[in-house]
């Protein structure tokens, strides 16, 4: 799976999202670019599970040096290495070990039930808090420190995405 030719955005308002970790999983997979495969990075040793399909936007470079992280709200989990055309609706701002590590929240373009969702304001506050709590707990259990700075709406996505695309070029 060579991602070098895959654009970060297939068309305006959408991103290409590569799933690394399906919703409900304790297995943490990461894309190994030099081999073009997903590898098992570690197994979380607690009851904490990923709340949504989690992955990255290819051909981007976030402040932490890796591709820009993204999550997609799905009714059913997909699988590691699945390509999803997704519509960003907001950003979870957090700092992991003192460095900014924003996470884009998306809905799948292929799900007509989510056609009308265009903003995190349309997502239940409890669901957004579940995502934030996952990252708090996940890092704490690993002995790390994470601070959740809060959610920003869809208007914050494009500047972050553009910055990460420019950093990758």
Annotated model-derived regions:
Residues 1-169:
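Hydrophobic N-terminal alpha-helices or hydrophobic patches in metabolic proteins across all domains
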């Amino acid at each position: 799976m060579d991602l070098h030719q895959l654009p970060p955005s297939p068309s305006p308002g959408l991103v290409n999202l590569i799933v690394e970790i399906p919703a409900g999983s304790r297995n943490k997979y990461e894309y190994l670019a030099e081999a073009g495969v997903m590898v098992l990075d570690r197994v979380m040793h607690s009851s904490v599970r990923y709340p949504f399909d989690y992955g990255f936007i290819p051909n981007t470079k976030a402040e932490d040096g890796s591709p820009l992280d993204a999550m997609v709200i799905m009714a059913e989990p997909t699988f590691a290495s699945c390509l999803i055309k997704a519509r960003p609706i907001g950003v979870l701002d957090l700092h992991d070990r003192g460095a900014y590590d924003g996470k884009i929240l998306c809905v799948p373009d292929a799900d007509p039930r989510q056609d009308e969702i265009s903003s995190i304001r349309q997502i239940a506050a409890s669901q957004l808090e579940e995502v934030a709590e996952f990252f708090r707990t996940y890092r704490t259990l690993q002995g790390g420190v994470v601070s959740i700075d809060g959610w920003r709406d869809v208007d914050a996505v494009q500047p972050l995405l553009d910055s990460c695309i420019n950093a990758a070029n």
